[in-house]
């Protein structure tokens, strides 16, 4: 498997180093105050400062930090994306700086706390006594997965206030600020944990249907498209609330927006996560049950809620190429992120029916990860060839659009330069790659290339 990042260039180094300069100056100031008391230690302190600066710069050279200059745009033939480039030009420098700062904070926090995934390394870490069956099951799945790849990219999507960041807090044990009415995540960002040599990356994204209006939603979608460009997505978690009873237009609107902008193949390896699963349900859910019965109404509501999403996603999954055997149904998991969540004797978070929710989510996620069905997101290339509203399109137009996308993709990493290849070589490459791309211009099966 390989990963193509069209934003990876020499310009990233310059922006990263510039974002690290304020911290470097702070370090030099501290060392300077110490050296004033003794002139003999000035040379040693300056050498230490240089070493620290090098470590800072090497740490900030991260592909996950989005940075794109005008020079890079021209070299990658992305200048036609006026909607994306114009909206991001003014905030580009600040975004790169904020992302670099956040990456360092997550690295420090992640090394200190690992609430659940630690059982994959050693049973009984920190005094936790997880069931032997649970530990062996997860370790076996991880071993099989590591035999194929050593990294997994999970994408979090959903409306504002449904608990995306709270779910991330539960999995990684970090403390991301959470607000209900406005999206607490302003820009997409990747949080990572390395467990027993396997790296789990969860991409947190801004919420939709934000109280700030449609313009914010539109800008957030552009941010997500830019951030995902060139990244391989292994699975998607769509987050919604467990306590709601209706599957209304708001749910459909958000799902349809993601399907239109990112492509239906997004849901090939996806699951729905229903948060606030242990909250009090509406009174109608308890009709026909005893007053002291909490498990019966909870199970009935969970099954009804899961059925709503399975029915809706069934229509989307039917759009995928059937020769890849897409799933007919999408899995649905209940999740409780509150710190007051009930726990079993082993210290695991449990739902009202006694099910360990985090165990089910993580094990289900590992089962979904299949590198053969992972897709390389190339949304910035697909948008370039989008036909007008009045144009119905035909087979020839679709084939020409895909050929244009292949040409742009090959220009990113073909050596020698793609433009210097002979016509016969180019024709042969385009013919072979044309069989690998789907109708959206993406690469759904990376291992077959």
From Swiss-Prot:
Domain AIG1-type G: 149-386
Binding annotation for GTP: 158-165
Region named G4: 275-278
Keywords: GTP-binding, Nucleotide-binding
PROSITE patterns attached to this UniProt entry: G_AIG1
Cited PANTHER family: GTP-BINDING PROTEIN A, GTPASE, IMAP FAMILY MEMBER-RELATED
Residue numbers spanned by region G2: 183-187
Region named G3: 204-207
Entry keyword annotation includes GTP-binding: yes
GO molecular function: GTP binding
Assigned protein family: Belongs to the TRAFAC class TrmE-Era-EngA-EngB-Septin-like GTPase superfamily. AIG1/Toc34/Toc159-like paraseptin GTPase family. IAN subfamily.
UniProt-annotated stretches for the region Disordered: 1-77
Stretch list, region G1: 158-165
Name of the gene encoding the protein in the UniProt record: gtpA
Residue ranges with Low complexity bias: 8-46, 67-77
Protein name as catalogued: GTP-binding protein A
One Pfam family of this chain: AIG1
């Amino acid at each position: 498997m390989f990963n193509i990042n069209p934003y990876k260039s020499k310009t990233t180094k310059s922006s990263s180093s510039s974002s690290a300069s304020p911290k470097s100056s702070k370090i030099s100031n501290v060392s300077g105050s110490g050296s004033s008391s003794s002139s003999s230690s000035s040379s040693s302190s300056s050498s230490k400062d240089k070493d620290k600066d090098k470590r800072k710069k090497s740490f900030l050279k991260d592909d996950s930090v989005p940075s794109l200059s005008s020079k890079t745009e021209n070299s990658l033939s992305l200048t036609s994306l006026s909607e994306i480039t114009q909206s991001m030009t003014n905030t580009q420098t600040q975004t790169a700086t904020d992302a670099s700062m956040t990456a360092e904070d997550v690295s420090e926090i992640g090394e200190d706390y690992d609430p659940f995934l630690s059982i994959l390394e050693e049973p009984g870490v920190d005094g936790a006594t997880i069931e032997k069956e649970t530990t062996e099951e997860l370790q076996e799945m991880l071993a099989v997965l590591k035999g194929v790849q050593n990294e997994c990219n999970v994408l979090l999507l959903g409306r504002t206030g449904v608990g995306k960041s709270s779910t991330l807090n539960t999995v990684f044990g970090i403390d991301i600020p959470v607000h209900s009415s406005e999206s607490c995540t302003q820009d997409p960002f990747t949080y990572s944990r390395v467990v027993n040599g396997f790296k789990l990356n969860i991409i947190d994204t801004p919420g939709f249907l934000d109280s700030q209006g449609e313009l914010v939603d539109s800008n957030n979608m552009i941010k997500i498209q830019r951030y995902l460009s060139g990244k391989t997505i292994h699975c998607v978690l769509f987050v919604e609330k467990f306590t709601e009873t209706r599957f209304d237009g708001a749910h459909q609107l958000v799902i349809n927006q993601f399907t239109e902008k990112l492509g239906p193949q997004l849901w090939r390896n996806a699951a729905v996560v229903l948060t606030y699963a242990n909250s009090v349900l509406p009174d109608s859910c308890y009709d026909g049950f005893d007053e002291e019965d909490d498990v019966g109404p909870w199970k009935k509501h969970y099954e009804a809620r899961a059925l709503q999403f399975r029915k809706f996603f069934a229509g989307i999954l039917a759009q995928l190429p059937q020769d890849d055997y897409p799933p007919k149904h999408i899995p649905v998991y209940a999740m409780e992120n509150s710190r007051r969540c009930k726990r079993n004797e082993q210290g695991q978070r449990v739902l009202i029916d006694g099910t360990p929710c985090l165990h089910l989510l993580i094990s289900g996620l590992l089962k979904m990860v299949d590198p053969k069905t992972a897709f390389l997101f190339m949304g910035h290339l697909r948008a370039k060839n989008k036909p007008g509203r009045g144009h119905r399109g035909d087979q020839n137009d679709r084939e020409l659009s895909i050929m244009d996308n292949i040409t742009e993709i090959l220009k990113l990493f073909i050596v020698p330069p793609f433009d210097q290849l002979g016509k016969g070589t180019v024709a042969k490459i385009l013919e072979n790659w044309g069989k690998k791309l789907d109708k959206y211009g993406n690469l759904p099966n990376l291992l077959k290339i």
